[in-house]
């Protein structure tokens, strides 16, 4: 099913219902090799198990990037064993992009890490991702 949405004065035509109903989370992958979440001092994402979310990402170039032009990564790992969550290994190009994802069904602590060596500060590019029941 297709729905019509008016956002910020612009008519968005033909968006699938899943996108229209998804919770939007604004993420910045910044030039200082840090994740930032709109409205939060400490970056953390808190979501419900199985929830549909739309990651609205602004990616800013740091000091280095991949050959394919990716400047930051966003990989979701289970905190307990650091294994990847399927479908959550994203690469960001410069600028704005959106990713529709379903939150894992297993409640618990996860961590988001950058998988692109974006600068000397790359190891510090991570944030908490909590899945609530």
Q: Residues of each region from the PLM?
A:
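Extracytoplasmic copper-binding redox domains, predominantly the cupredoxin/blue-copper superfamily
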Residues: 15-133
